[in-house]
């Protein structure tokens, strides 16, 4: 009330106020009775138009707006700051996991093409390079001995034996990119996601990628033609167990046949929603 009165009288006194604007109304001593909620505007064909008895005042001109702005500043006794009102976004860690063949790499590749400011961590592996794979892009291909040295030196945030081969996440890569303000994307198998949950807790976002059905997943893996039938059997049997661990994740995204774009969009929506959170996750690696 006091502020309103100060404001009204300061506005009335202010030489900056445009003359054409009506003088500020007196503040009533007692608060007015609550008004009924405003009715929604309805179409002109219906009988529900809500007419105000007075026409709205004409919009102020550019100069008037400027004067009003300065008048408000004078009334409050401070200038209006142009500093952002929302806190700056913090770099975040996104963990994308799911059964083998579900499309993790495919989704990540599209995300990489779509979004800037994200770093997709290249993990290290002792597995042999597949045709078409590039060292430093798909993986850092190292020998088993080199991998064991990385473990010894505590260079890996997480590592695991995946289908008989070592896979692990270089810590320094995450630190370097987070320091530059990048968001981090990690692609791991389900056991890797469980380990990362223990290390990172709620500070990272965990997304479980699934196919629309087991049948679709198996067909996708067969179609990829990267595994022998024995290896396929292991991956498919593992996938059956892995789907049961969905509850440890924050989000589930369905990557259905022929709709890779839909899955990518959904992951993007998750990122956007997380960025808009008031209470943000803070990461410390
Ligand atoms: N929505 C989709 N519809 C059809 N095919 C897809 C879709 N998403 C991915 N694929 C294809 O499915 C195969 C498996 O995808 P991808 O290699 O990305 O899986 P992954 O989860 O990374 O597997 P892994 O864990 O074994 O590395 C690839 O041939 C890919 O092109
Ligand atoms: N736990 C970890 N899993 C990883 C890591 N890097 C990749 N992966 C996962 O391994 C499987 C098999 O990969 P493939 O290239 O041999 O088909 C797949 O699910 C990857 O996501 C890692 O650093 N840690």
Curated annotation (Swiss-Prot):
Residues 1-66 are annotated as: Disordered. Residues 91-272 form the Guanylate kinase-like domain. Disruption phenotype: No visible phenotype under normal growth conditions at the permissive temperature of 30 degrees Celsius, but mutant seedlings develop chlorotic leaves with aberrant chloroplasts under the restrictive temperature of 20 degrees Celsius. ATP binds at residues 98-105, 255. Signal peptide: none annotated. The keyword GTP-binding does not apply. The keyword Lipoprotein does not apply. Residues 1-19, 40-50 have a biased composition (Low complexity). Essential for recycling GMP and indirectly, cGMP. Essential for chloroplast differentiation at early stage of leaf development. May not be involved in the synthesis and maintenance of the organellar DNA during leaf development. Keywords: ATP-binding, Chloroplast, Kinase, Mitochondrion, Nucleotide-binding, Plastid, Transferase, Transit peptide. GO terms for cellular component: chloroplast; cytosol; mitochondrion. Its main location: plastid. It comes from Oryza sativa subsp. japonica. Residues 1-42 form a transit peptide. The active site is at 130, 224, 235. It is found in: Plastid, Chloroplast; Mitochondrion. Monomer. Transmembrane segments: none annotated. Belongs to the guanylate kinase family. GO terms for molecular function: ATP binding; guanylate kinase activity. One of its GO terms (biological process) is regulation of developmental growth. Its EC number is 2.7.4.8. Residues 20-36 have a biased composition (Pro residues). Pfam families: Guanylate_kin. This is Guanylate kinase 2, chloroplastic/mitochondrial. It catalyses: GMP + ATP = GDP + ADP. Gene3D superfamilies: P-loop containing nucleotide triphosphate hydrolases.
């Amino acid at each position: 009330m006091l502020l309103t009165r100060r404001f009204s009288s300061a506005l009335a006194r202010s030489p900056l106020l445009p003359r054409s604007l009506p003088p500020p109304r007196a503040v009533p001593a007692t608060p007015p009775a609550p008004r009924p909620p405003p009715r929604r505007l309805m179409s002109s064909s219906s009988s529900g138009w809500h007419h105000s008895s007075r026409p709205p005042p004409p919009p102020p001109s550019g100069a008037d707006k400027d004067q009003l702005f300065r008048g408000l500043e004078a009334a409050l006794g401070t200038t209006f700051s142009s500093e952002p009102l929302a806190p700056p976004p913090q770099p975040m860690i996104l963990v994308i996991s799911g059964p083998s063949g579900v499309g993790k790499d495919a989704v990540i590749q599209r995300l990489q093409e779509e979004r800037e400011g994200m770093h997709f961590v290249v993990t290290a592996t002792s597995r042999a390079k597949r045709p078409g794979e590039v060292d430093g892009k798909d993986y850092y291909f190292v020998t088993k001995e080199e991998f064991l040295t990385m473990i010894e030196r505590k260079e890996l945030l997480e590592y695991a034996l995946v289908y008989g081969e070592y896979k692990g996440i270089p810590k320094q890569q995450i630190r370097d990119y987070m320091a530059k303000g990048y968001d981090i994307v990690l692609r791991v198998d389900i056991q890797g996601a469980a380990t990362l949950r223990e290390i990172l807790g709620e500070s990272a976002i965990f997304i479980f990628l699934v196919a629309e059905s087991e049948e679709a997943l198996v067909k996708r893996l067969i179609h990829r033609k990267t595994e022998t039938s024995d290896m396929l059997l292991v991956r498919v049997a593992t996938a059956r167990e892995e789907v049961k661990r969905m509850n440890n994740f924050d989000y589930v995204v369905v990557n259905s046949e022929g709709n890779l774009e839909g899955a990518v969009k959904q992951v993007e929506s998750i990122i956007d929603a997380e960025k808009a959170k008031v209470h943000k996750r803070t990461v410390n690696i």
